[in-house]
Design a protein with these regions (language model features):
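Cleavable N-terminal signal peptides
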Residues: 9-10, 20
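A short, hydrophobic C-terminal helix/tail in secreted or cell-surface proteins
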Residues: 219-241
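Short, surface-exposed polybasic-aromatic patches that bind anionic ligands, especially phosphate groups
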Residues: 23-216
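C-terminal membrane-anchoring or membrane-association module
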Residues: 236-253
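Sec/Tat signal peptide C-region and signal peptidase I cleavage site
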Residues: 16-22
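Bacterial N-terminal signal peptides that target proteins for export
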Residues: 1-8
Length: 253
């Protein structure tokens, strides 16, 4: 991701409840403005099927371009399986969407621009791609400031060296080992189609025109509503919501 952002307009409405499974058009319209280690963190703003929506990213391996439009399939958390999300197709354990829901909730509940929100975002990326997160942070260490790489790694993995595996009591361990289920979260997975087809792309395989995103299935107040009020800060320009491995010039598996 780049750091060039311009304020340009006003976003209007909350997302409405979608069908359990449906195809839709998505345009990525903005970022929350917070970046860490050269990368913008969640939440982001998108137009999903004509509705302005706050979205959170759970995909560290692929990339999304601000202003780009793509076809995607929406799947409610209660209907997630191995064939209807990009991570499911990649062979990921779909039970981990319970952890994704927990961390998405933390991202949206954290103070905008806070170190807590940075930690929650990177922990969410680490659910399906812990090694990718570890490799990027190891290659781009931050040694000073309000949140060093060692502090971030300690919060996510329980180890300042960012081992890629979660120690008991760490944020990632709590998310994955507290019995959270996908069905308990009122959220929807937004998985991109392979360009020119109605076939879902597979995360980490290089055929995704955008990352996988998560959004609230039902319009509700609190943090998500606050973010939509802030979403008047639409963004323009060539900003990338990128995989850290790509920014580090590493190839994608």
């Amino acid at each position: 991701m780049k750091k060039a952002v311009q304020i340009c307009g006003l976003v209007l409405a909350m997302c409405l409840a979608p069908a359990a499974f449906a195809q839709t058009s998505v345009t990525l319209t903005g970022v929350s403005g917070q970046s860490y280690d050269g990368i913008y963190v969640s939440p982001y703003y998108a137009n999903v099927g004509g509705t302005s929506t706050v979205v959170v990213c759970d995909d560290f391996a692929d990339e999304s371009n601000l202003g780009s439009t793509w076809s995607a399939q929406t799947t409610s958390f209660s209907n997630v399986n191995s064939s209807n999300t990009s991570w499911g197709l990649a062979g990921a354990n779909t039970a981990l969407y319970g952890a994704v829901g927990y961390l998405t909730n933390l991202v949206l509940g954290a103070a905008p621009g806070s170190t807590t929100q940075v930690i929650d975002t990177f922990a969410l990326w680490a659910v399906f791609d812990p090694n990718g997160v570890e490799q990027y942070l190891a290659a781009h260490p931050i040694t000073s400031g309000s949140l060093t790489t060692a502090q971030l790694c300690s919060a996510i993995f329980g180890s300042s060296s960012c081992t890629g595996s979660a120690v008991k009591g760490s944020l990632l361990w709590i998310a994955e080992n507290s019995g959270f289920t996908a069905a308990q979260w009122g959220m929807t997975v937004l998985s991109a189609d392979i360009p020119g087809t109605s076939q879902l792309c597979t995360a980490e395989k290089g055929n995704c025109p955008a990352q996988e995103f998560i959004y609230l299935s039902v319009a509700e107040g609190g943090a998500a509503a606050a973010y939509l009020l802030l979403a008047g800060l639409c963004c323009g320009g060539a900003i990338f919501l990128r995989s850290k491995r790509q920014l580090a010039s590493r190839s994608i598996a």
